């Protein structure tokens, strides 16, 4: 043992479903892609996984659900408010608007 510090990031440990990867890229609140780029991303991912015959069907089923998941994730600051975490009203308002925006995008898909 050399005494050096080693960090293992278990957050990305294992395999992810390509459908989830494709969808999360579109839904992540940090992404500010226009509709043309999002469509291009999905088209390219579909081509990459063309041999996966269930990819498109799984994507159609999962994509709106994963959008709702992200709409809930951005609301996490509401869970920690009052638990010693100093979350401002401004932050909560911003997160609520992000969630509403994601829900509106999901609504357009269903």
Locate predicted features:
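Active-site acidic catalytic loop and adjacent metal/ATP-binding pocket
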Residues: 1-21
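Glutamate identity and glutamate-enriched acidic tracts
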Residues: 11, 16, 35-36, 44-47, ...
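Active-site activation/catalytic loop segments of kinase-like enzymes and analogous catalytic loops
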Residues: 17-53, 64-83
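ATP-dependent phospho-/nucleotidyl transfer catalytic cores
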Residues: 61
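ATP/Mg2+ or Mg2+-diphosphate-binding catalytic cores
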Residues: 72-110
């Amino acid at each position: 043992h050399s005494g050096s510090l080693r960090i293992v990031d278990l957050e990305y440990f294992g395999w992810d479903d390509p459908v989830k990867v494709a969808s999360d890229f579109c839904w992540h609140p940090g992404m500010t892609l226009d509709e043309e780029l999002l469509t291009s991303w999905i088209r390219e991912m579909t081509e990459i996984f063309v041999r996966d015959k269930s990819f498109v069907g799984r994507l159609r089923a999962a994509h709106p659900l994963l959008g709702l998941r992200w709409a809930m994730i951005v609301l996490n600051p509401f869970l920690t408010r009052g638990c010693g975490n100093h979350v401002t009203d401004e932050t909560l308002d911003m997160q609520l608007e992000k969630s509403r925006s994601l829900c509106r995008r999901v609504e357009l898909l269903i």
